Curated annotation (Swiss-Prot):
<feature type="modified residue" description="Phosphoserine">
    <location>
        <position position="514"/>
    </location>
</feature>
<protein>
    <recommendedName>
        <fullName>Protein STB6</fullName>
    </recommendedName>
</protein>
<feature type="region of interest" description="Disordered">
    <location>
        <begin position="447"/>
        <end position="469"/>
    </location>
</feature>
<dbReference type="InterPro" id="IPR038919">
    <property type="entry name" value="Stb2/Stb6"/>
</dbReference>
<comment type="similarity">
    <text>To yeast STB2.</text>
</comment>
<dbReference type="GO" id="GO:0070822">
    <property type="term" value="C:Sin3-type complex"/>
</dbReference>
<comment type="function">
    <text>Binds to SIN3.</text>
</comment>
<keyword id="KW-0597">Phosphoprotein</keyword>
């Protein structure tokens, strides 16, 4: 029953269609190649451009690529043609998610080779950085992008516009100086802007994968080792994408690692002046992993040569947790806090005098990893935050290959799956075009499934993916026998006429040369020897076909014979080729007007030389004009700057003049106010005292010397009473004397009353 339901569901599937996806990385990551019934191949599409979205790559979205329509046939992109059902609801689950994400920023556009999802750049978000892939192939520039993007996030690279170019030597030198790499580490660096990786088939064996050369890049390799180290602590969630791209997930994982493990085992916080993956972070993380690795060696739980051999590392870690009863508490084998604390506690009890345990460890392959270093010593001394100290204590493994170029790196011995990325994967399986043709034949002529008999259903139990190869007589090529050819599932009366006509026409048009048809005016008779033309044969008697056209009348409209059309077309082509050969023999390859053509050709070359000379003069004049134009622009910029300075100075001058005018007005107002007050005081004095001396003093000249002498005479006169006292007080000398006398009296008062007992106290202290 379940098998019948499956076949009914397959019979109700929508017809297949061709879909074009230029994002190789997205297709490989979602694992569409795991479905054996999907056929695909690589194709080239003209008139489109592709762009990498920098922020999407950092966020590790499914799609990091957008496609834009240009209409220019010189713009070519490489993509994957996939044969899928027309209804996306019938796609596999992974392709459904990819399709939903594509519809968020693009819309389907039908092309000659299939449906392509195109993005309108005018309505695209301007906050996202678009990197134009000039070569049109994501495979060729992805390694450059990954290296340059990591250098940019490490503050060793430049602008985003250069992420797809060759890595600058200045960025490499800065990275090598910052992370203590020797110059020999970059001997296998990318040497071209676009490098085509070696391709491999999806069915290749492990041995063939191991022989593929790996492009060693220290920047990407260092990031990959950091991501593997974070996965040991169960902090890196992208386990299938440890590809060396310094993404936002790596940044968040490093921050979590510092909060949980960095503060606890190193006693410091993450340096605020460092980047995402600074030297302190690299040394702290890798040294903690190496410390745990050496301590597992001391406990005789680790047999791997390389701490970054993940399978062996997890096996040793699981053995340690099982040995001390920690595996029951952990659902996932990882370096959690409980495991690390137990590892530090147990390994501290181990002594170098334990010769028996030392012999057990020496029997393993520790010397290949440690080299000159002692693993027991390194298990307690390699934990550091200084990168120089870490590099000095590295003697082999992946870290030794990375920093010192010695020993075998990971993946050359065990972890082969990392090399099988979309860069080395060959996107080719089956023939989507042939599958689409068979599908069109099936769905274009199929009858409803209710009309099928039980016997037909039993005969069609064969899987559609298992096809038998037959030979197509019509076109002379191999094809696949699908469900549609197993039983008659179409209306013969409707399909048979057109199918027979097409087959007859193609058979006649592409028919090979044969002896009975040599003199029919269609084929070249010169290629056939004279002996073959003289063929003996039986005398043909008269047939009805010779008089058929005269006896039987054709009624219009009528369908002419497709065989006659094919023969007439071939005859016309043969006559045209013969006429062309005769014309060439008679008139030459240039035709009748060969002499005139030669003269025209000569005149054309002379004119072309003159035009080239004029073009060179125009170029020189254009260069001079551009040079003068640049000088004029520089002078204009200088004048503009001086003009701006003049404007600023004039505005400052106007401002200062306004301030000065305001202050002058304030001074004038203050003087007027003082004059009014002075006049009021004079009037009050005259009103209160009608003395003539006061009026004379007030009306005296403005000379200071005369005024002072007159005031002294008034004060010293005997007739002054209250008025003299007032002027005496107003006199500066009197005020000065009064001040001195008041100070003397106050000093005497304080000395007499307040400090009366001071000498006695001083005596007591002595």
């Amino acid at each position: 029953m379940q098998l019948e339901a499956t076949h009914q569901k397959e019979n109700h599937l929508s017809p297949l269609a061709s879909f074009i996806f230029p994002d190789f990385r997205a297709l490989f990551n979602i694992g569409f190649n795991l479905y054996s019934n999907i056929n695909y191949k690589e194709v080239d599409i003209n008139g489109f451009e592709i762009y990498i979205v920098e922020q999407w790559a950092a966020q590790r979205k499914i799609s990091t690529l957008i496609t834009s329509y240009t209409g220019n046939l010189q713009d070519t992109i490489s993509a994957v043609e996939v044969a899928l059902p027309e209804d996306p609801e019938e796609w596999p689950c992974c392709l459904k998610k990819y399709h939903e994400e594509l519809l968020k920023f693009s819309s389907p556009k039908k092309t000659a080779k299939g449906t392509l999802f195109v993005t309108n750049l005018s309505s695209f978000k301007s906050t996202l950085n678009l990197l134009h892939v000039e070569c049109g192939n994501l495979k060729k520039i992805w390694k450059n992008f990954k290296t340059n993007y990591d250098l940019k996030r490490l503050h060793c690279g430049g602008r985003s516009a250069q992420l797809l170019k060759k890595t600058p030597s200045a960025s490499i030198a800065k990275f090598a100086q910052l992370y203590k790499f020797p110059n020999s580490a970059f001997s296998h660096e990318i040497t071209s802007d676009f490098q085509q990786p070696s391709l491999q088939n999806d069915n290749s064996s492990i041995s063939s994968i191991e022989n593929i050369p790996v492009n060693h890049c220290p920047v990407v390799e260092l990031t990959t080792l950091v991501q593997i180290s974070l996965s040991y602590f169960a902090l890196f969630e992208y386990k299938k994408e440890r590809d060396g791209l310094l993404c936002n997930g790596t940044k968040q994982s490093l921050e979590k690692w510092w909060e949980i493990y960095g503060k606890r085992y190193h006693g410091i916080d993450k340096p605020k002046n460092e980047t995402i993956l600074g030297p302190t972070t690299v040394a702290s993380l890798l040294s903690l992993v190496l410390t745990c690795y050496f301590k597992l060696m001391v406990e005789d739980c680790m047999s791997a040569k390389d701490p970054f051999d993940e399978e062996e590392f997890y096996s040793g870690l699981y053995a340690f947790q099982k040995k001390y009863g920690l595996s029951k508490n952990n659902k996932q084998t990882s370096l959690d806090e409980l495991t690390i604390d137990k590892l530090f506690e147990v390994s501290s009890k181990t002594s170098n005098k334990d010769i028996f345990k030392f012999k057990k460890v020496v029997k393993s392959t520790v010397q290949d990893m440690t080299g000159k270093g002692n693993f027991m010593h390194l298990s307690n001394e390699i934990l550091t935050t200084d990168l120089d100290t870490l590099v000095k204590n590295i003697h082999g493994g992946s870290l030794g290959k990375l920093w010192k170029g010695r020993s075998a790196s990971r993946k050359e011995t065990c972890m082969v799956w990392e090399r099988k990325t979309f860069l080395s994967f060959k996107f080719e399986r089956g023939d989507p075009s042939l599958q689409l043709e068979n599908n069109e034949l099936f769905y274009g002529t199929s009858v409803p499934s209710e009309q099928l008999t039980t016997s037909n259903k039993e005969d069609s139990d064969t899987q559609p993916t298992k096809r038998n190869s037959i030979y197509d007589i019509a076109n002379g090529s191999k094809s696949s026998l699908s469900i549609s050819s197993m039983f008659c599932n179409y209306d013969e009366t409707r399909y048979k006429s057109t199918n027979n006509l097409n087959r007859a026409y193609r058979g006649e048009y592409f028919r090979r040369n044969s002896i009975p048809f040599c003199n029919d005016g269609i084929h070249d008779t010169k290629k056939i020897s004279a002996d073959l033309n003289k063929i003996d044969g039986l005398y043909r008697c008269n047939s009805y076909s010779e008089v058929q056209n005269a006896i039987e009348l054709w009624s219009l409209p009528f369908d002419s014979s497709v065989i006659r059309l094919a023969r007439d077309l071939l005859k016309i082509q043969s006559l045209m080729s013969v006429q062309r050969q005769l014309d060439e023999i008679r008139d030459g390859y240039l035709g009748k007007n060969s002499q005139r053509s030669y003269q025209n050709d000569l005149m054309f070359r002379q004119s072309l030389n003159k035009l080239q000379e004029m073009c060179e003069r125009c170029k020189r004049g254009s260069n001079e004009f551009h040079w003068e134009y640049g000088n004029m622009q520089n002078k204009q910029q200088i004048l503009e700057s001086e003009k701006k300075d003049m404007k600023s100075l004039s505005s400052k001058l106007k401002y200062n003049v306004r301030i000065l005018d305001r202050r002058v007005r304030d001074v004038e107002a203050s003087v007027d106010h003082f004059d009014r007050k002075l006049e009021d005081v004079r009037k009050k004095l005259l009103e209160q005292n009608n003395s003539k001396d006061i009026s004379m003093a007030l009306e005296s000249p403005c000379d200071k010397f005369e005024f002072d002498s007159f005031m002294d005479s008034i004060v010293q006169s005997q007739q002054t009473k209250y008025e003299g006292l007032c002027f005496k007080i107003l006199d500066k000398k009197s005020l000065r004397k009064l001040k001195k006398e008041f100070w003397k009296w106050s000093t005497w008062t304080f000395d007499t009353f307040l400090y009366k007992n001071r000498p006695n106290k001083e005596k007591d202290t002595l």
